Amino acid sequence: MNINLFLLIIVVITALAFDFTNGFHDTGNAMATSIASGALAPKVAVFFSAILNLVGAFLSTAVAATIAKDLIEADLVTLELVFAGLVGGIVWNLLTWLLGIPSSSSHALIGGIVGARIAAVGGHGVIWSGVISKVIIPAIIAALLAIVVGAVATWLVYAITRSVPAMSTDTRFRRGQIGSASLVSLAHGTNDAQKTMGVIFLALMSYGTVSKTASTPPLWVIVCCAIAIAAGTYLGGWRIIRTLGKGMVEIKPPQGMAAESSSAAVILLSAHFGYALSTTQVCTGSVLGSGLGKPGGEVRWGVAGRMATAWLVTLPLAGSVGAVTYWIVHLIGGYPGAVIGFSLLVAASVAIYIRSRKVKVDHKNVNENWEGSLTAGLDGSDEHKPHSDVGPKLSATLPRYRSSHHTVGVRNAS
């Protein structure tokens, strides 16, 4: 086996690993509000999301072409560069998942690839007009649009149903949330799976298996990416689901449906035009907007501020990881460079996973009241069994915002 074929295999495996992390990292985009409002049981929600991500991945390839052709010069691409960019995306995804921050998998991937490209040949190898016009500007516009649409939609929902009893309204909107959340999952699969398709497409063009004039990736690439993102989604990114569903605002069913519908509309529209949009930023913007649009609603601006900070540093920090990885793999060179680079990625991933087990967040405790941070007030054991000191522990620290929705009693039903 020659070194280029070996590198291609490593790149494809790493790309599918990124797609897998994208699935569990971004599950919260679609299902956090439905889980928080009690519209769907947690395990049922992630199952629906996985199926619809799988279906959505087959609906379009416009974003895949953007990733493969519109951000960096395809003639200057090497397999080392693609691998390094993927490492940047995976490491950033795992770090933000550990912290429960819903940052952009899309921007992590793009940042990693651009950083590796700069490390390889300098800034002239990057199509900056493409980065600005198809990544940065759409992200800013989409996030702001999602906030506005989410706020207006929520305000309208509450205005229209003002005279309807709350119990009746909540019941009906929970049913509606099943449809709106499903639409977001479908949109996520349509938008995000394509990004990994685009990376593998780029690698195949670099290797020479696919013509640089090809407009769509091979069918096997589409199928593998669809399966990878669906499998990751089914695991459920509980840490990020908790932040989106409980951390920023307290979600009621009318808010949830308004936020999800707003997100789906923006994401599907962007996918149609081939924009490499961050579904995370759109969904987070919609949730924030729902908090602003609800009469008497509250937003935890500290949590929102941490998210915004993560968004700002995603491109440069993921790019830095991609650049360092490229230097390591390139300087060592050959089989040793590829093996060492891949081994470092595995080691970093395992270390982050072990750290996350110290306080486990899963379907059993994802809807616990937010007490100031992701894991505050949660049981640190794997089984979440009640301890004799749980009562005093929870009462000792008064949470800043206490949930009052009536679905608390059923959140452990799954």
Curated annotation (Swiss-Prot):
Keywords per UniProt: Cell membrane, Membrane, Phosphate transport, Symport, Transmembrane, Transmembrane helix, Transport
Record's subcellular location: Cell membrane
Membrane topology annotation: Multi-pass membrane protein
GO biological process assignments: phosphate ion transmembrane transport
Domain of life: Bacteria
Recorded GO MF terms: phosphate transmembrane transporter activity; symporter activity
Catalytic activity: phosphate(in) + H(+)(in) = phosphate(out) + H(+)(out)
Span list, region Disordered: 377-396
Family matches, as InterPro entries: Phos_transporter (IPR001204)
Compositionally biased residues, Basic and acidic residues: 381-390
A GO cellular component entry from the record: plasma membrane
Function: Low-affinity inorganic phosphate transporter.
Protein name: Probable low-affinity inorganic phosphate transporter
Organism: Mycobacterium leprae (strain TN)
